[in-house]
Amino acid sequence: MFRVLIPSRKLVPGCGGFMGGIARIQAYSTKKDKSEEIFKTKIQQREKEAQQKLPEWTKRDEAIRNRYGEWNPTHRLSRQQIQDIRNIKDKMPHMKTIELANHFKISPEAIRRILKSTWVPSDSEEERIRLRGEKRKDESLVHKKEMMNDIELARKRLTYGKSVTMGGINVPRSGGRKGKNLRNTFSTDGKVNFDSNNSHGYYNRKGKTKAFKRKPYVENVGDIID
């Protein structure tokens, strides 16, 4: 960058004279500094040399990562789906990895690992895998059944005001609230039905007068004067 100072003359209106001054002009060079270009060239050369010194397995992993992306599985596939991927590749070898990944909705790296693997379970291992799958299925059904029972007990507690046991913890009744005060609050499927236009019926009981006991008649001073 360089600066240039140029004398300037401006016409003064009204008197016909001139007013002197100095005009400052700043100019910027569009060419890059040679030292900056030399520094960038040295950095690129060192990175290239370091890349060449890496072992072959590191270069191979880097190439696979650049081609298929990072190894980040989104969900697990079943044994049958894994076998289907291998069968499709055997019958249609022209099918690309990215096409299989889009069909099964997983990453291309997962497809590459499945096709590269040659492990085949034996008969005993298949039986063990089958039993483990059945056990997990039974445990899931029991867990869902217990959860539905807890929801039903909570619904009854809110409806009838009774203490129930949920997950081994005894939950006491809440203030003696009666079932008629919470009618139609819960539906048959356990969901809450809340009506904002009729919410006063559950809380302050608007529209109902307070019951009071009638007192016996007693003569006062006005009756005696009359």
Swiss-Prot record:
It is found in: Mitochondrion. Disulfide bonds: none annotated. Its main location: mitochondrion. Keywords: Mitochondrion, Transit peptide. It comes from the Eukaryota. One of its GO terms (cellular component) is mitochondrion. Residues 1-25 form a transit peptide. Belongs to the RRG9 family. This is Required for respiratory growth protein 9, mitochondrial. It comes from Debaryomyces hansenii (strain ATCC 36239 / CBS 767 / BCRC 21394 / JCM 1990 / NBRC 0083 / IGC 2968). The gene is RRG9.
